[in-house]
Amino acid sequence: MSFYKITEQESNHKNLEKKSVSELVNAMHEEDNNALKAVNKVLPDVTSLIENIAPKIKEGGRLFYIGAGTSGRLGVLDASECPPTFGTPPEKVVGLVAGGIPALYSSIEIAEDDLSQAWKDLSDHNITDGDFVIGIAASGTTPYVVGGLKACQDNNISTGCIVCNENSPLSKYADFKIEVIVGPEFLTGSSRLKAGTAQKLILNMISTISMILDGHVRGNKMIDMQMSNAKLNKRARRIIMEELGVNEEKANELILLSLIHISEPTRPY
């Protein structure tokens, strides 16, 4: 099958520097809506991916995201939200970005060209066939991600990918692929825009639904949320009051008993 980089295609919007701010805002918003439409088309693929991640998580496996640039940062962002939101240990959902931590703050473009580095990074986390790895790359060609996913398949580790081009090299090494075709970017080739938006929406679904299936949500409440600041402490108190029908004093007492998170007070007995 042929491979064509839609993500590098010429923008549908011309002479941007000659447009008014209002025109630019409306044009970008129109393209953002196209990202939503693209995600809508791949919901069955997202469903299939999550249905295959969930058993791994439930059996004690881990979820890894690997990516470079914006794609890698989005994976790290999604992973970093799991401990405070769902009470998971930091090693349960892990985001790896080409170039490591410095790449979160500044662009280290050369780091993405190493085919073997992602596997080294995964090996540092003692990756096993009980884990699941998702490669994130708008183009689907990033060597860091392609090499990492290929090595995972070679070692019988389940894989998925989130890409914005069809029939990409990365898709070849994904057991479960999500090809979310957002079309040309507003700014030609700037995949941090629509592609990044679509990737973030899909990552939201992957982590949130996986955690729901793993028992970290009751009703629509985050029952394993970490009470790490005043805002979250108030939220925890409100959840306990609503779920158990107790007053604020009793909720505070239960919070003190639970010490760390709110799952025990809110679980049915």
Which residue ranges define each predicted feature?
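Short, basic, glycine/proline-bearing loop/turn elements
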Residues: 31-41, 107, 132-135
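Glycine-rich phosphate-binding loops that contact phosphosugars or nucleotide phosphates
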Residues: 64, 68-201, 208-216
